[in-house]
Amino acid sequence: GFSVYGDYAPHTAMMRSFSRGNNFPTQYPHYGGQDVKYHFMFQFLTGNLEYLGMRIDIAYNAVSSLSLWCFFIMLYSMAKRFFGSMSAGVLSVLFVVFRSGTAFFRFAYEHLQAGDLWETLAGNTAFIGYTPNENWGLWNFNVYLNQRHLGFGLLMAALVLWIFLDWVEESCAEKDKGILWLKNRFLTKKAWMFKKPNTALFAGMLLGLCSFWNGAAVIACLLILMGFAFFSDGKLDYLILAIVTVVFSEIQSKMFVWGSVVSPSVYFGFLAEKKSLPGIAVYLFEISGIVFLGVLVLLFFLKKMERAVAVSILFPTIFAFVASLTPDINVNHKYIIISYAFLAVFWGGAVSRLFHWKGAVGKILSLILALSLTITGIYDFAVILKDNDSGHRVSVNLNSGLTSWLAENLKKDDLILTPEYSINEVTMSGVMMYLGWPYYAWSAGYDTYYRAARAVEIYTTASAQVLKKTVEEEQITYILFEEGMKFEEKECREDVIADTYPLVYQSDDGRIRIYGTKE
């Protein structure tokens, strides 16, 4: 559908590189010939399922849906553990699926003023939002639909957090109160001594092995665990977990990545219009309503353990507003999404408790609170349904003649120069493109500007010598020319390419021609 196909492009290309190719050691299909700077194990699994005979859509949907469903079960279980209520668990999941935010209220007000609210609500197929890139679906359930590997990462993170809730629970059961209780979390032998080092070792291995399933989920989990460690005894167990996680992550990085996996930098303010603490507070209120700022009020009504966990869950969000690990700051939205998902547990508990407070008044207030926490997400979900119905589809022939020829004739070390394709018959062949859609590779940390300039040189040069020299330097083995194509808005010349290299493939309609550059 229209709301998800953009993110499906790099996922499906990577999956096909395993099912129809031999992409190991792994390269990034939209920037072939280099190491992989992207967590790809989800695509590796689904690609291998297709290779073993499962339809690609079934493999893709089965793994991601089961992972997300199991994560929801973990959220439900956490809410029930904290609040002893099934309704708290159900509400927690609903608050993740239907996000909070101010967008719907502002949208409704503007169109009430214009007198076209009902027509707009019925006909609109675009996400609403008034903050940068909110109309991408940056904060709603669409994130889980297009980033299918996120559910698995969240599930593994939730399992590790569930294990270490025992540490927090035991420490919060101590009878000391206030500053004395907090002091004893640092100034006693028990605060540091091992409790269950074997369990910590296992959890570290599990989390570390997930680094190439979803790196953001692993980092967010470590940040939350840092908060757990602050409020827990047995801090050396947390140290074991952190060290083992980093070691296992580094081992995988050395296997798959030639250089650095991340490019860390200080970046204050994320996407907030005003890069200040008040500006960040306003931004958080706009994108999430009361979920983040309101938790500061909730802390006064929570028990000691619940407070410790809620504060810890804020750490990934704090990280998102002060640091960046990739060239694309938008990627930090995942840390906020992860914090939001776990904070939903406490809002589920709050609404559930309020419903049982002081008869009818409590019930009315809880319904108002629940509606305010979901109305924006409910409308977003309606947009998702409309934008992915039968009239809003992007279709690709998975077994076209072009796809089959590329899969059969191009090998792992071949590199094909193409237009800047996102998702089409070429990407579905699993081949390594010199430069696919630039945003995917750029946001993963590749130098797309360099390759774009070289590609322009190849497609536009009038000199056969320049063409051959550039192709040889870039180790390009095939050049694809599409009838009437432009590259970076520049007119392309086929005549020089055709005079220099032999034609090795032409599509049935003559629109696509491929030239081989290998001697």
Question: What are the language-model segments listed below?
Answer:
Residues 355, 359-519:
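Extracytoplasmic
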Residues 141-146, 185-192, 199-215, 226:
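Membrane-interface alpha helices of multi-pass inner-membrane proteins
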Residues 2-7, 52, 136-148, 251-287, ...:
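Membrane-helix boundary/interfacial segments in multi-pass membrane proteins
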Residues 1-156, 176:
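Active-site lumenal/periplasmic loops and adjacent helix-entry segments of GT-C-fold
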Residues 170-199, 232-240, 295-314, 357-363, ...:
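Membrane-interface helix-loop-helix junctions at transmembrane boundaries of multi-pass membrane enzymes
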Residues 65-68, 150, 219-222, 329-354:
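Hydrophobic/aromatic-rich transmembrane helices and adjacent perimembrane loops
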Residues 91-93, 233-255, 290-291, 309-310, ...:
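Hydrophobic alpha-helical membrane-interfacial segments at the cytosolic entry of transmembrane helices
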Residues 159-170, 220-230, 286-307, 353:
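Hydrophobic, aromatic-rich transmembrane alpha-helices
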